[in-house]
């Protein structure tokens, strides 16, 4: 097993929470982990680059960890041991619904419980729920903390040949790639609206016959800015 930790960044910026988690993960997994970042504003291009690097290397897995995510390394070990081709850890949106938090605070005496119940999460489970060893099958999940086996990219390359192109002369060629698998390019929903790169990726994998599993019984942080604004 050899895992490439892939992290898209904006101008190379990483949060301290991300860095602390990555150091702990390296301590847990040792030399089984390599690390690669990208820098830019287009997430689909960044994720395409990292996926394509796996195909042009001997890595068995790609572990997406976004630069604003923190997590316990034991969670990554659980995801590895679950041994599914694609598994994601669920994290909250970086949004505070003040009205919902106010309602939850009135319903719960524990402030932490009120806070947790006021958040929304980046996933949609299948209905009815399908569970295995504490993991649930999902329609989609965010790719901010997602473990993907090499076979997923090989399958998408073979079943979607229009997505696999020579990289020469492109952004991807400048990243050192010979070919690029553009599996994160946005798809369009039934209304003709572009979907996010992570939802599009999940849908492509499921259209190829794959499954997505998620775990949400561990604590994952999604770091973001918050402006404290008021009059004293």
Residue ranges and their predicted role:
Residues 58-70:
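Short beta-strand-to-loop acidic/aromatic patch adjacent to the donor-nucleotide binding site
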Residues 1-4, 158-232:
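C-terminal catalytic/acceptor-binding lobe
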Residues 48-61:
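Active-site nucleotide-sugar/metal-binding loop of Leloir-type enzymes
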Residues 36-39, 90, 216:
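Residue-level recognition of beta-strand->loop/alpha-helix junctions
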